[in-house]
Regions:
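Hydrophobic, aromatic-enriched alpha-helical segments typical of multi-pass transmembrane helices
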Residues: 1-238
Length: 238
């Protein structure tokens, strides 16, 4: 198998990450409120298997997406050239964001262990909130990742212009989701109406982005910076 084909398979890992993430979402259950934790013991006893499976699927999804990030970095840096500052920033921010997604599953996995059977309801609620906060904080580096991808895309046309603007929207959605900690029971909370509108933004970018990468790898010339876009796109990351 030649190098180009390997690179295309690496880009296709974005679809694999999405599939694992979708399977994890399908296992979602309505959790008891952490402000009234008395329902946690019964909930955890009844849903232990689903909770553990969901966490492991999310962990695998995040791990596969880290693999995709390596392919994304190579794709961007070939077009950006020079030091590849923004391509490296996108890669590093994405690794931090999805690393936090992996670590954020640890509290939920802990709740499925045998030692958690005798855990006080209040302690279970604290662990649940801890995992949730980790996942919310992860949106900050993910927003940086999307904005960096957007700037490279709009400067070099390595992705179509419309896909660059989708990256801007995905970054804005991630930034907004980070404000969920301000009102944990508000519309940005995990099961709030606004979160259902904002979380899919990254998927709306990922599917066409991975498709474009697969099609262009190995048969596109290195793009060049468009001076007329430089000033405007720099403003996106200020």
């Amino acid at each position: 198998m030649n190098e180009t084909r390997w690179q295309r398979w690496a880009a296709a890992s974005g679809f694999v990450a999405l599939a694992f993430g979708a399977a994890a979402v399908a296992l979602e259950r309505p959790w008891p409120s952490t402000s009234d934790p008395d329902g946690f013991p019964a909930f955890l006893a009844a849903n232990r298997g689903a909770i553990l499976a969901q966490s492991m699927l999310f962990v695998i999804s995040a791990g596969v997406f880290m693999w995709f990030l390596g392919s994304l970095r190579s794709f961007l840096i070939e077009a950006e050239g020079a030091t590849g500052r923004l391509s490296t920033l996108a890669f590093a921010a994405g690794m931090i964001g999805y690393g936090l997604n992996v670590v954020g599953q640890a509290p939920q996995i802990t709740l499925t262990l045998p030692s958690a059977a005798g855990m006080a309801p209040g302690s279970a609620a604290v662990l649940t909130d801890l995992g949730w906060v980790m996942l919310i904080v992860a949106n900050i580096p993910l927003a940086v990742m999307f904005f960096a991808v957007a700037v490279v895309s709009l400067r070099t046309r390595v992705f179509p212009v419309w896909l660059g603007w989708l990256a801007v929207l995905a970054g804005a959605a991630a930034a907004l989701l980070s404000f969920a900690v301000v009102d944990p029971s508000g519309p940005l909370a995990p099961q709030g109406w606004a979160s259902y509108l904002l979380y899919p933004a990254s998927i709306v970018w990922l599917v066409p982005a991975a498709t474009v990468m697969i099609r262009r790898i190995g048969r596109r010339p290195a793009a060049t910076t468009r001076p007329e876009l430089t000033e405007r796109t720099e403003q996106l990351i200020r």
